[in-house]
């Protein structure tokens, strides 16, 4: 039996096989087969060929080539002076929705500030409610400023829309001013939540995961907590009516 192979490396080895002296010739080659040749008589010649690659394989498994990826047009850095350099995957619809939400937050803050001024009057003198609505106004203004900062982070343009002038009188002959004001606050918080959910839907529609995360983490949780808290205040004011219980409720707000 004989099988040839190329690039043969041969060496000899003497051993005793079956009592006869034999000379084995081992050969290592670069082919992909194993062969042996056996001569008649007491002499045996063996040729062994081990598999090896003809050429080194090219490097594989590269999954990211940055300089090739950077050739994509949408990754080019703008050179126009009035164009944001940081803007990426931020739609015009999302930009407009953020500007609208800024306006919502400022409007609600303005109403709360008017409520603060009303309850701080000397002839109303419900200092706890005044404190509550002043803090609520500041909180809504902080929300607006947070949205402004986010708009700039994403490369959008902040556009401030007009703010509606709120009422200055909150008397209600049946409910009383405290309950009426708190019910108004509850409605405003629910309206704000509805507007925030709209911004979140805009983010989903435009596959803007970063905007969705921002609204979820910074606003939505806090919003439902505010709704729950004010809903409890409404319930308590309904229980106490318009009498002395309002003063006790006000004192609790003042010292919270």
Curated annotation (Swiss-Prot):
It holds the Pfam family Ferritin. It catalyses: 4 Fe(2+) + O2 + 4 H(+) = 4 Fe(3+) + 2 H2O. PROSITE patterns: FERRITIN_1, FERRITIN_2, FERRITIN_LIKE. Residues 1-54 form a transit peptide. Its EC number is 1.16.3.1. Belongs to the ferritin family. This is Ferritin-3, chloroplastic. It comes from Vigna unguiculata (Cowpea). It is found in: Plastid, Chloroplast. Oligomer of 24 subunits. There are two types of subunits: L (light) chain and H (heavy) chain. The major chain can be light or heavy, depending on the species and tissue type. The functional molecule forms a roughly spherical shell with a diameter of 12 nm and contains a central cavity into which the insoluble mineral iron core is deposited. InterPro entries: Ferritin (IPR001519), Ferritin-like (IPR012347), Ferritin-like_diiron (IPR009040), Ferritin-like_SF (IPR009078), Ferritin_CS (IPR014034), Ferritin_DPS_dom (IPR008331). Signal peptide: none annotated. It is an enzyme of class 1 (oxidoreductase). Stores iron in a soluble, non-toxic, readily available form. Important for iron homeostasis. Has ferroxidase activity. Iron is taken up in the ferrous form and deposited as ferric hydroxides after oxidation. Fe cation 2 binds at residues 140, 189, 223. GO terms for biological process: intracellular iron ion homeostasis; iron ion transport. Residues 88-241 form the Ferritin-like diiron domain. One of its GO terms (molecular function) is ferrous iron binding. The lineage of its organism: Eukaryota, Viridiplantae, Streptophyta, Embryophyta, Tracheophyta. The keyword rRNA-binding does not apply.
């Amino acid at each position: 039996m004989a099988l040839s192979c190329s690039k043969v490396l041969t060496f000899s080895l003497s051993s005793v096989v079956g009592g006869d002296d034999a000379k084995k010739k081992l050969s290592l080659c670069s082919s992909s087969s194993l062969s042996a040749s056996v001569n008649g008589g007491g002499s045996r010649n063996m040729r062994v060929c081990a598999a090896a690659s003809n050429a080194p394989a090219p490097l594989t498994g590269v999954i990211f080539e940055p300089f090739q990826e950077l050739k994509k047009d949408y990754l080019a850095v703008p050179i126009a002076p009035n164009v944001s350099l940081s803007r990426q995957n931020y739609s015009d619809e999302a930009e407009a929705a953020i500007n609208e939400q800024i306006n919502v937050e400022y409007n609600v803050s303005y109403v709360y500030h008017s409520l603060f001024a009303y309850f701080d009057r000397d002839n109303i003198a419900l200092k706890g409610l005044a404190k509550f609505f002043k803090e609520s106004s500041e909180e809504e203004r902080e929300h607006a400023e947070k949205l402004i900062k986010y708009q700039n982070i994403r490369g959008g343009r902040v556009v401030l829309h007009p703010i509606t002038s709120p009422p200055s009188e909150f008397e209600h002959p049946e409910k009383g001013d405290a309950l009426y004001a708190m019910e108004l606050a509850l409605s405003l918080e629910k309206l704000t939540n509805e507007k925030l959910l709209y911004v979140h839907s805009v983010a989903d529609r435009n596959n803007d995961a970063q905007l969705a995360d921002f609204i979820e983490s910074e606003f939505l949780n806090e919003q439902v907590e505010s709704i729950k808290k004010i809903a409890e205040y409404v319930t308590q004011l309904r229980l106490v009516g318009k009498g002395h219980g309002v003063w006790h409720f006000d004192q609790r707000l003042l010292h919270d």
